[in-house]
Amino acid sequence: MLKPPIITSNDNNNTKVAENLNDLNNKGKMSGQQIESFSPWHAQTSSSAVTGTSELFGSTYAMLSDHSVYPEQWSGKQLSQSVLFEQPQIQPLVGNSYDPPVRFDPPYAYRATATGYMPTVPGLSTNSSPYYPRTSGYAAGQQFYAPSLSGVPNTQQLILAAQVAQASNVQQQLQQQVLRPEPLRPATQKSTNGVHRSTSNSSAETLRNNSVSAATVSPSDDNSLNSPALTSSGSAGSGTPPLGIDLNNTDLESGDEERVMCMACRGVYPSRRSLTGHIGRNEKCREIIGRNYLDALAQGVNPPIPGTDAAIKSGAITTGADGMSPVCPFCDRFISHYKGNIRRHINQCRKSAEPMKRHRVEAHEKQSPKKKVKKEQNEMYQHEYNDHDSSSMSGGMMNSPKISPPSSSFYGANSSDLCSPGEYSNSAYEPYPTPMLENTERTSTETAVLQDAYICEDCDFVTVYKGNMKRHLNTCHPQPEFKSLKEWDQKLEGMRASNLGISGDRLQERLAAHKANSSRGRKPRKKKENNTEESESIDFKNILNSETGALLESLASSSSSMGGYSNGNNFQPPPPPPPMLL
């Protein structure tokens, strides 16, 4: 058994320990791990002129041991970091101040200031607890416990953490520049015509442009133009503002989004459907657009019809370059963007001799039918009540109080207490008549329609509806020579009863005959006679009834012939019994 060599000198021992530590440090660097610079040694320091294995094993055991005691001879003497090994230091990771219980050694001092950088590196976490010195009652003196070597980052991890921190700082600066940009300077932009112009993005320039557009676009000095350019709403009556626009730029479509402009109020909308709704609700925009179209026609310019391929290719509906929109210039009727409807409607209005101007009901004029009828009745009652009051006052009854209109509940409850009809009629107050306006108007319109019904010349078909007659002609009597709506209208107008000279009773007879022959009536279906048993039973019943009737007639004739017969007692024989029926 080998004994540890006797200690000869402390200087020689310290030199050998430093050499051994340098060897271990080099091995640790090669293996990718760092060794703690202030690990105490538990074994006794001794010198060996042969191998020095005792110092090596003792230092290794001290590093791996959890209960190594710091010797008193080492308490006042610490080795510098340059003597052990050089450790790269990262300034952002080490704070300027630290808490007293935290051991401020460079490999372990990763404080809360570096929490933003640690999670970004794999294997480098901030949840490793800092080193706190612990004391034990069993060992005398001060004791230190080294942290585990697995949590200590190596040089490559520290360099990677520094690179990630620098990249995150650059990204954060870029985000701050995006969120809080500097004021933009006027830049030159190239328009669609190839002319350079400078546009200012400042708020003052934007306000000035908005004020100029409001002053130039408005057709009159009236500020009630319900348009997005003058109000904060994107469409009339809606709460969505229009998109910001450049008034000089008419190229509003890009590859990503679709933007359309109303040429009347210069309001930009995100889609054609929203522009359609705006033009349909805003009457002034329709008038301005229709006026532009009529002015173009008067000047000899032939603008494309809305909805056609030429209009779509020229950008009439999309950008409004030529002032076109889905509004019919003949009848001022709003049309959808569907090109089939627009083409058919405009062709019909152009061919018609007198295009009808339809009265457009505004929002404040719209009323439900119930409210309209109730309002008319109230006005009629009030008018008659005022007339009766004026007549009663002119008749000399100045002191008679005004009587309120009667109610149905009052009549139902106190009908027995009222005066007689004669006395009631002689008084100044008279009951109000029941209104019959609706029935009279309805009957008058019905009679007018019946007097001018459509009568087919080829058959007995009669109808009061134009669509029914048109469908009847297309189905039963196709006429391919009629290709335009105008020819169809002329044909249908010629089939009216007034033009054919049929009216009065003759027209009523035709209508009644058509109703009787119509398939719409509830006629009973004819029974099918395919079943032979049912037909035979019906024939047998008919024969039996005929034979029974003949037998009864013969008996009646025989009884009448025996009327003078008597047996001396003036007693007539009883009639024969009736025949037995099967």
UniProtKB/Swiss-Prot annotation:
Keywords: Differentiation, DNA-binding, Metal-binding, Nucleus, Transcription, Transcription regulation, Zinc, Zinc-finger. Expressed in hypodermal seam cells, the somatic gonad and vulval precursor cells, body wall muscle and head neurons. GO terms for molecular function: DNA binding; zinc ion binding. Residues 188-226 have a biased composition (Polar residues). It comes from Caenorhabditis elegans. It is found in: Nucleus. DNA-binding protein which binds to the promoters of let-60, lin-14 and lin-28, possibly to regulate genes involved in hypodermal and vulval development. Together with miRNAs mir-84 and let-7 may direct terminal differentiation of the seam cells, exit from the molting cycle, and vulva formation. Does not regulate the expression of mir-84. May promote hypodermal differentiation in association with swsn-9, a component of SWI/SNF chromatin remodeling complexes. Residues 227-244, 551-570 have a biased composition (Low complexity). GO terms for cellular component: nucleus. This is Zinc finger protein somi-1. Its main location: nucleus.
